[in-house]
């Protein structure tokens, strides 16, 4: 049985889940050690370390059959697990997305293949050509057909609405200016989501913290918050990262669009303007007033 000290939620992790899911998640938190023990026995893994964000708890495990490093991911929201499982199955043809080994969406549980060496791209220099290769893989290796009846995937507009709704709830002391700015940006983003000329499987949360370096330096995407819609959405974080002037944004947009067939530079530029205020919201709430934060906040007009 896994060590309860490993599987019991520490207060900061519990607080993040409470902020995301509300007090109803308390019972799930209490039951987590028993659930992890059952899943570890069922899937033949030994949890070694724990981590996670605001929607799940993740355990680095050793698979008993072959000593392979794998990851057990558990969330209190079965919908989140079902969406991720369906997306990973949709991308099963590409090594540029972490592999799905087993899933029990009803229990909110996924078993994911490890990525070696698995170094996060966040905080490191990255080459546009490498990011472009990842974006090409995501666009070209996903399902050809739109989700059918019974699919867990929802339209990109739903993802957009969720992200802005979360930011609006957290706007807090920024007051009416922040709310007006976010509502204006949300309208722009929803219009883009509704006007996509083509649609495909969208990762939905493709930033540097959710990309690892795999074998041979290949970039590998993890932790999708997937949707079906405009694939240009997935490039937004990459054209905005480290950018703080209109000229630099346009240059990065044109460069990346030139490397990814089907990526529309004008639509990507419009997405950047629509989502800039959303990406800047945490820094603005923290009172930051640096050049980059002001630039992002001003993108929505």
Where are the language model's segments positioned?
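Juxta-kinase regulatory segment immediately upstream of eukaryotic protein kinase catalytic domains
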Residues: 2-48
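ATP/Mg2+ or Mg2+-diphosphate-binding catalytic cores
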Residues: 20, 251, 279-301
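An alpha-helical support segment within catalytic cores of ATP-dependent transferases
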Residues: 27-36, 143-203, 214-215, 257
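A conserved alpha-helical element in kinase catalytic cores
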Residues: 30-33, 55-57, 66-111, 115-138, ...
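Active-site acidic catalytic loop and adjacent metal/ATP-binding pocket
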Residues: 48-64, 100, 187-233
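A glycine-centered beta->alpha junction motif in the catalytic cores
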Residues: 77, 94, 106-125, 140-144, ...
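Active-site Asp-x-Gly
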Residues: 213-258, 265
């Amino acid at each position: 049985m896994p060590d309860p000290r490993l599987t019991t939620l520490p207060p900061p992790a519990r607080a993040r889940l409470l902020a995301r899911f509300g007090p109803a998640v308390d019972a799930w938190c209490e039951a987590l050690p028993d659930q992890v023990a059952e899943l570890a026995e069922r899937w033949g893994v030994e949890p070694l370390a724990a981590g996670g964000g605001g929607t799940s708890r993740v355990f680095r495990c050793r698979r008993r059959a072959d000593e392979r490093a794998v990851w057990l991911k558990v969330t209190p929201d079965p919908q989140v697990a079902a969406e991720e499982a369906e997306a990973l199955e949709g991308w099963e043809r590409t090594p540029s997305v972490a592999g799905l080994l087993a899933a029990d969406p009803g229990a909110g549980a996924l078993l994911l293949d490890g990525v070696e060496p698995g170094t996060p791209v966040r905080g490191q220099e990255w080459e546009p050509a490498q990011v472009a290769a990842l974006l090409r893989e995501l666009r070209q290796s996903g399902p050809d057909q739109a989700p059918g009846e019974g699919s867990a995937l929802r339209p990109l507009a739903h993802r957009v609405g969720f992200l802005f709704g979360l930011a609006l709830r957290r706007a807090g002391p920024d007051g009416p200016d922040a709310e007006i700015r976010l509502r204006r940006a949300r309208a722009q983003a929803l219009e883009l989501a509704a006007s996509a000329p083509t649609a495909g499987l969208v990762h939905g949360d493709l930033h540097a913290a959710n990309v690892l370096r795999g074998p041979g330096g290949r970039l590998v995407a993890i932790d999708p918050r997937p949707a079906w819609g405009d694939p240009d959405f997935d490039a937004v974080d990459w054209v905005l990262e480290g950018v703080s002037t209109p000229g630099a944004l346009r240059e990065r947009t044109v460069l990346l669009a030139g490397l990814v067939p089907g990526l529309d530079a004008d639509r990507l530029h419009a997405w950047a303007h629509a989502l800039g205020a959303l990406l800047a919201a945490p820094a603005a709430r923290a009172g930051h007033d640096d050049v980059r934060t002001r630039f992002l906040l001003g993108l929505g007009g």
